[in-house]
């Protein structure tokens, strides 16, 4: 189980990313449309003004049950070892173990 503070920090980053998403997208669109380099630098400075934690690259996917940030399966939202345990316990409908 991940520390509560790390899970809370990740949720805070998600809220910030949602809040500043439209601002970042509009500034990036402006940068791509303007041909002059000096104006691009000015807009790039504005792009750096939102908080650092509002950038989408700072987000991690976390396991739904344990909060583990690594080895997550996007389809299930679970980490690898929790996914394996749930499949073995038949708690995930439609998921089967591989056999060949």
Swiss-Prot record:
Location in or out of the cell:
Plastid, Chloroplast
Sorted alphabetically, the keyword list is: Chloroplast, Plastid, Ribonucleoprotein, Ribosomal protein, RNA-binding, rRNA-binding
Q: Name one GO molecular function term.
A: structural constituent of ribosome
SUBUNIT field: Part of the 30S ribosomal subunit.
The UniProt function text for this chain reads: Binds 16S rRNA, required for the assembly of 30S particles.
* Superkingdom, taxonomy of origin: Eukaryota
Coiled-coil annotation reads none
Q: Which GO terms describe its biological process?
A: translation
In terms of NCBIfam families, this protein maps to:
PRK08881.1
Q: Which family does it belong to?
A: Belongs to the universal ribosomal protein uS14 family.
Name the gene: rps14
Name of this protein: Small ribosomal subunit protein uS14c
Is Plastid among the key words of this record? yes
Q: Which organism is it from?
A: Barbarea verna
Primary residence: plastid
Q: Name one GO cellular component term.
A: small ribosomal subunit
């Amino acid at each position: 189980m991940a520390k509560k503070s790390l899970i809370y920090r990740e949720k805070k980053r998600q809220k910030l990313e949602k809040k500043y998403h439209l601002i970042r997208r509009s500034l990036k669109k402006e940068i791509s449309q303007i041909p002059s380099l000096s104006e691009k630098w000015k807009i790039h400075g504005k792009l750096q003004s939102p908080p650092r934690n509002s950038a989408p690259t700072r987000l991690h996917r976390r396991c739904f049950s344990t909060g583990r940030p690594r080895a997550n399966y996007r389809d299930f939202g679970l980490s690898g070892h929790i996914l394996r345990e749930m499949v073995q316990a038949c708690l995930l409908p439609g998921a089967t173990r591989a056999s060949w």
